[in-house]
């Protein structure tokens, strides 16, 4: 018992100090022991995520969720598994996991809401995309600029041109990403031309 507790203590210190390979070895030794299985699996899943080993994230995460369906750590497991699925190109499972994550916390991370919104958009679920992306744009940064561009596209798909115009305008007036800015400006200009709504000056100047 003392040896197991000592191994867990050393593994936790290694994890906290960024010695992830050492921590992984130590937690792997402990993960088949009932007293340490849940905590060890959780740390192992986190380490694989930090190391971008997404297939292993999913494998360990599945075992953790199956063994401990009511764990208080499951919200974070949903989050990192959702990200792993997204990076592997499985947007259906990314939506499945990230939507569980968002439902399980009062303060979902903006980056995860953005990924969820993009996945919804790519799957043609534009109303859900608007909901997720709309919760992303709380700060003046590159993430919000990208989210506004996707919001504009989502509103266009929903035939809500007024909200689309405002979203494109928000992305176009931000300068964090030049390509996003130009794409937003182009879409904003098209909408102004189409709806004869004047902002930013006359529509003819927008196209210049």
What kind of region is each of these model predictions?
Residues 1-208:
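Acidic, polar-rich low-complexity tracts and alpha-helical solenoid repeat scaffolds
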